[in-house]
Amino acid sequence: MKRKVLALVIPALLAAGAAHAAEIYNKDGNKLDLYGKVDGLHYFSDDSSKDGDQTYMRVGFKGETQINDQLTGYGQWEYNVQANTTEGEGANSWTRLAFAGLKFGDYGSFDYGRNYGVLYDVEGWTDMLPEFGGDSYTYADNYMTGRANGVATYRNTDFFGLVDGLNFALQYQGKNESQSADDVNIGTNNRNNGDDIRYDNGDGFGISTTYDIGMGFSAGAAYTTSDRTNEQVNAGGTIAGGDKADAWTAGLKYDANNIYLATMYSETRNMTPYGKTDKGYDGGVANKTQNFEVTAQYQFDFGLRPAVSFLMSKGKDLTYNNVNGDDKDLVKYADVGATYYFNKNFSTYVDYKINLLDDDDPFYKDAGISTDDIVALGMVYQF
């Protein structure tokens, strides 16, 4: 009986992160769910900046209120707290999600706040590894590739109720700028990122669509285009030029019969950051990247879920040592991992990231890109 329950519950948990939330209020059309997890996590690596304790806690809520038969208000908030620093170091925490919106029956939903960019509608299919993954080209606060500030999102499920499985989304992102290099307050000045202009963005627009073909197969695609800030366009050096930052992606997945397979391909232009730009490193923004991810997983009825994956991002026409037109792998690794679910609330996992970047290439040391392997061990309590 336990095996049958796990076989049903675990895929549902993986498909929707907060689907197993604890309902704390449900009355008179008002509903509030609380969800979260504590991950006791440790990395083993020759890279001293990665090696060691990585424990964190994540908590959030999802709420909705029934306004009338066709109109529902909703909101979500999610917060991350790192637990691998001393109490004297101060807060090491941040808001992951915070948005509110309205759902108009079959006519879709509209929300605004900090939310996932539409490119992640496809990227999320391969971002299913026990610990690593989802990092060939998607980063938080990098345009609409991951979690992002100031996004207004319209979503429609089943194409106005007319086509089962056909979903689409439209998204607009407002400008987000850090303080300029000469400490002059310009633009929005709402990025507290150490003046790293790589994570700024101008106004942008995105669209995504996914289709549940049936028999476990789904296909999806997304596209975004954004203005770049004046600081980004004029930075020079290893920072790509160009007035626009563009990205597109397409993906496929199969999720049935305890088997999960997913793959995606994407390209970006004037968008993707690599390496570090502080402490004398020569990281930058790639003029173009070509990105690929694939994962294969199997869910055993007794709770074990092994996974094998491969991810890569190739930077094109990079500027390195004052030479233009260099091509380099920015991300390239194989990943072997496994998760064991004791029940719907507790699991343990191991994840081995096998770094395939060439540690003899001076580019990676100069840019501050790690070429070391990482083994992650974790225990998770979730609710």
From Swiss-Prot:
CDD domains (alphabetical): gram_neg_porins (cd00342)
Protein name, per record: Outer membrane protein S2
Gene Ontology cellular-component annotations: cell outer membrane; pore complex
Role summary: Forms pores that allow passive diffusion of small molecules across the outer membrane.
Membrane topology: Multi-pass membrane protein
Compartments it resides in: Cell outer membrane
Annotated GO biological process: monoatomic ion transmembrane transport
Natural source organism: Salmonella typhi
GO molecular function terms attached to this record: porin activity
Gene: ompS2
